Amino acid sequence: MSSVTAVDADGRLPLSSMLATVDALLPLSLLEAVRDVDTPEGVLEAEFVDELRNKRLGLSDTVYTQIKRYSEAVRRNQRTAQDEAIALARLIGRRPDAEAVLRAAGRFLAHEAYMTISPPTRGMLRVLPSFVSRPLALRKVRSIARRYLNGNVRRVGTYVLLEIPRSITVGVAAGGAGCAFYEATLRELLKLLVGTTGAVEHTRCEGRGEGSCEWRADWRGAERAAERSQAA
């Protein structure tokens, strides 16, 4: 097993350490997505299941073992080498369904990170007026992005900007599909925190030679659309 690093509850480490490692939830999310996508629906014959294990990566003993390993690291609040996550992302990037798997991984990470927020706080985010809940939600997005994505979040007007100084998925799949992981994470996280999400745009991409990757989410757009619909 590769070395792991323990962190505090807020995931606070020096920036150099943060960029050299990732929270174990990140590689776990990639593997859980592979397993989920590769698992067929319904009850199957035992012989067919054995055959699938040989053909589908997500059902292999290797993936099962690695999921157990990363799950234990998550339980222990540990980080692992970023190169491991990059290797997993590249492996997924060779699949024809790479974008779908990466989006599923992003949603998984967002949900698991959201569940680390205390139930009372999650409840307050749902019932408090937006002028109170939005700043609280933004603080949670910042904390989650820093800990689980090695990312930086800031607000500009009605937009939330997520910057990833070193993406683990950039260039892993054709057509920039690798970046779908972070887009899906941000979209799902905002949906869970504030109930609605407007458009999420990939405004800057490392793969296009534009420096670090950046996404812009209009987290008030969907809310305004819902208000107009109710008024009509």
Which residue stretches match the model-derived regions?
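Beta-rich nucleic-acid/ligand-interaction surfaces
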Residues: 199-219
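Short, surface-exposed acidic
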Residues: 61, 197-200
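Short secondary-structure junctions
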Residues: 142-149, 190-198
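Short, non-transmembrane amphipathic alpha-helical segments
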Residues: 178-193
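General N-terminal targeting signals
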Residues: 119, 179-181, 215-217
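N-terminal accessory segment detector
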Residues: 1-159, 168-177, 206-210, 223-232
